[in-house]
């Protein structure tokens, strides 16, 4: 009973315990998968997957249902285990004076390094804004890749919790596939619209290395839950996510330097940190949209083109896979059809990345504020 009261007190008063609420996301996903599996198991019907029909019998355990139950059980068990481990860490942590809860929960961020010489360039009324000191490419890349500056050794548990949450979000959004995008010659393709945005967000949460691991792991979990895909298409999705992630990182953070700027505002001899999008930063964000959208859209379209050849194993049957009528001169061996195919898919996927980047721009400040609030950045 005393242990329970102590745990409740820690959860209420310890500021770092708020991060444990993020585990509610994988918990909700696992319960949703279990419910989905139970509904499949207890009902019968005909499911239209677009390219084939799935006949389901009541109370007959299929491979899809078995995989769903196993994955959901593993996610649920890991979530409960991480929550228990987090509670144990809270109880084992150093005790503080609970008579001053506000002081006990304070987690001030370290003061930013400022360049006072830049004060004249950021004069806003009575406020003097100092820009943060710039880092060299090698120093910033090492910091972003390993994420060392975002987590101390004591907070490694929080990194694993966040990785689990981001994998769950990426997996859930990868299930939202947009089918029936009609191509000019009458066939259609389907693509995933939202999951790449999670990778853009994850860079400033867990670092580039951990985000790359998320991009590698998620497509294979998706294959387990939705086995209508082939391993070759899974390799394509994995490779595409990795390439897009690194292209976005180098173009956005290094070539155009479009990241929101961290500044320190001095008011009445007191320093206040804030995030500012200067005019130069806004222009850089707009310019970064063009190459990232076009390059990533072309790479994903080219991946679809190569993937069909790999899946079918021979060039002559490509038309039967992509074009339903199998008419003469309608396959992807014809150079004109190849150009039309790549132009169409590049346009579609460029629009996809445009919306994802605009979404990332809209939440970028919130991402960094959350990271600072939990001491992650």
Swiss-Prot record:
Disulfide bonds: none annotated. The chain crosses the membrane at residues 21-41, 66-86, 163-183, 197-217, 236-256, 292-312, 339-359. It comes from the Bacteria. It is found in: Cell membrane. It is a multi-pass membrane protein. Its main location: membrane. Keywords: Cell membrane, Membrane, Transmembrane, Transmembrane helix. This is Uncharacterized protein MG147 homolog. It comes from Mycoplasma pneumoniae (strain ATCC 29342 / M129 / Subtype 1) (Mycoplasmoides pneumoniae). The lineage of its organism: Bacteria, Bacillati, Mycoplasmatota, Mycoplasmoidales, Mycoplasmoidaceae.
